[in-house]
Structure formats: structure tokens, C-alpha cells
């Protein structure tokens, strides 16, 4: 049994400067980069995988959908497992499972095996993603150190998708689509070996029963919501399937909240959501991802379908966004976070990103990469990084360390739901606008893209408004390290 003196000794050790914490940050970042890359790297390889495995056009979406459903649906469970089992154990288990799933997918002899492997990847990503963020939240508690650590995390979140497109293009064009999955193996091994050596012990763990009814309700509600958004892209929001899924999601999530408010050992303690600053950060993350993700997808299609870029060229075309995201994370967010209130970064950042979206509304079928796409990517990269770095920090700040896993899972779930909703909503807007446009196919597509991007800009402005109104936290103050 631990004593108060032992507890003080543990805190004292944690407060001592330790190089191993920064080494640990490097391996946590490697793991997070693997997850971020996987969001887009397989999308580039999908046409080649479809042809090689003989999948139909109707079935190919399941390579993406299987990952999205398991990732989004299991995040809260994954975060709570980290709290129960310990962060180091959960981190290593997530890496091992993700690597095995990637190996199965890379060697898949059939399309069905590939889909199952992608579902397994999503399940282990749902364990790994909140665990990685939780490790950052409890390891780096002083304002300057926290700003640096979350700048690393934010730069990966902002540029990982773009890097995934580039890497996917290189691997598909010069090797084979299977390497878009195999590439995770060496990355996971490096992160796992490093994590095993330098990560601290699992620390305080929750000594309580797992809320199995809460797990079932949360998983069913999130899966139904994410699947409804996915299905709406092809079937429309008025289809019976989508309406049924949305109804199921609403009912099960309402029952989940009812359950969590009354059980002694909730899966998601509602006090985590009730905090004004954390709740505001969750909403901002969801809105920013919703506004950005749909337009990000459309821009990929624009470059390859309208401008006829190869997958590799399209990946290279996204490099400015990645560079700008790194610059925004390190030169702006990391420097200013210890000195200003979170909303002083988040609101202007969202407005800068909205300006980048507004530029994209001016695209033409003839193309204007240097005049429009390039500056838009720079604005998007700078703006998004200045939102995400303080948002992720605020969403996990001052949380009981025994609940840091589920708190980290909640902000990841907000990101996942935001991406799914944004893609579905903006796709609906784009299709409707293109259908009502009298002109050539390319012109109609670009018109639909422009209208959808305008809506994306509006969503980003709304994110700036939410950050200004809801997030009232002041300048970061030092607090006791965990």
C-alpha cells in the first residue's frame, strides 16, 4: 500500500528534469505519426488494391469504412483501457496490434481479408491514439514544456495526412500498394522498442469495474453515427438507412449519457465534459476537422481528376501544407502558448484557416496551383496548427491522471466524428451544387467544390466564434506534474 511519503517521493521524482521524457516524446510522436499517415496513405493505394484483389466499385469503400468504424466506435473503450491497464502497457499493446494488423493487410490474399485487417487497424488505433495523447498530458505539465510537447503532437496532426498522401504515392508508384501497409511494421517496431525502454511505468490505474453497459452503448452510438455519415455520402441524408442509423445513434448516445450520470463507475465521467474549457475544446476540434477534412478530400480529387496529377505529384502538391503546419506549430503555437490564453491562438488560427478555404473557392478548371492552391495550403497549415496545438492541450489539461486516457479518447472521438460529419455534409453540398450547374463535367465538379469549400470556411469561422465564447481559460499556469 502506498503511503503519503511515498506519494510525495514519486511526485518529486516526476518533477525532476529528465531527458528520458523528451526521448519518450520522440517515440510517442513516431506512434502518432503512424496513425496520422494511415488516415490517407491507403486512400492513394486503393485503386491499385482494388484491381489486384478484384474488388467491385461498390465494395472498395469498405477499406476506408472498416477502419473508420472501428476507430471511431472504440475510442472511448480504448482510452478507458489505458486508464485501467496503465498507459505504457496500452501503448505497447496498441503498437503490437497495429503492426500485426498491418502485416495481415499487406499480405491479404483477398479483398475480404484486407477489410478485416483494416478493421483491426482501426481497433488498435483506438487504443493507441488516446494512450499517446494521455502520455503527453500527464508527462508534460509545465507550460513551456507542455507547449513544446503539444507542438510536436499538433504538427503531426496537421501534416500527417499530407505526408501520408506523398508517401502513399511514392510507395504505390515505385513499389506496390502492399507497402502502404507494410511500412507500418518498422515504424511500430521502433516506437515499441523505444517506448519499452524509456516510457515510465504505467503509474496510477483505475481500480474499478469496467462499465460494460456503457461500453456497449457508447460503441453502438458512435459506430452508428460514423456509419450514417459514411453512408450519407453515397445514399444521401434522406435515405431510410441513414435516418435509421442517425436515430439509433441519438437514442443510444442519450441512453449512454443517462447511464453515465447514474453509475458509480462510468466509462466516461461526465465531469470531463462539463468543464467549460474542455467542452469548448472538444467542439472546436470537431468543427475544425469537419471544415478542413471535406475540403482536403475534394482538393485531392481536384489535383488528380481536374489537373491530372499523378498520385506522386498530388502528394508533392500537399507539401506546402505540411511545411506550413510545422512552422505554425513550432514558430507560433509553441512560442506563444506559455504566454497567452488558448483562445488567443485558437480563434485567430481558425480565421486564418477560413481565409485559406476562401481562396480555394476561386479555383477554376484550368488550374492555378501557384496563385491559389499554394497560398491556400500555407494559410490552412498555419491556421490549423495554431488551433490544434492549444486545443489538444486544453482538452487534456487538469484531468485526474486516472481519467487521462478517456479524456484523451474524447477529444480523439470529437476529431473522428468531426471528420466523418464534415466529409458527408460537404460532399452532399458539392454534389447538389454540381448537379445544378449547367456546364462541362470538370466545370461542374469545380463549382461543387467551390460551394462546399465556402461552407467549410463558414464552419471554421464558427469554430473561431466557439473558441472565443466558450474557452475562458487564461494564460497557462504551472501545476503539479503527474
Residue ranges, per PLM feature:
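Interfacial loop-to-helix junctions that mark the boundaries of transmembrane helices
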Residues: 58-62, 112-120, 175-183, 209-211, ...
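Short juxtamembrane and helix-loop transition motifs at transmembrane-helix boundaries
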Residues: 140-147, 173-179, 203-209, 305-313
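Transmembrane-helix bundle of Major Facilitator Superfamily
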Residues: 2-197, 331, 336-340, 346, ...
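12-transmembrane solute porter fold
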Residues: 21-37, 42-44, 57, 63, ...
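Flexible interhelical linker loops that connect adjacent transmembrane helices
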Residues: 14-15, 190-219, 261-276, 337-338, ...
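Alpha-helical transmembrane bundle and helix-membrane interface signal
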Residues: 141-143, 201-206, 229-243
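C-terminal membrane-cytosol helix-exit motif in multi-pass small-molecule transporters
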Residues: 3, 133, 185-204, 219-231, ...
